[in-house]
């Protein structure tokens, strides 16, 4: 399948499927250690490398911790909620019980000053 990041389309096998933007909120899982900063949680390097890969793939548009770091918010481009859940389930922190999907909402990004 050929992904066309930023163009809202994905082409594969002669079919075209529309891509959409979503606001994805990730929350701490049951194995999160509240006594340790985010970068000192077990598996930080593996998690960070995984997330960097999602950015490089064009899946994550932007994201990071919000407020006190209890949650993260990401703008993602995907075909739908199933794709989002499937891809995020591959995060080493998901399988380790450190992070889980809190919510997924379709998001119309009308303003984008990144150029």
Question: Positions of the model-derived regions?
Answer:
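Conserved, structured core segments of small domains
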Residues: 11-115
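Leucine-biased recognition of intrinsically disordered, low-complexity hydrophobic segments
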Residues: 2-4
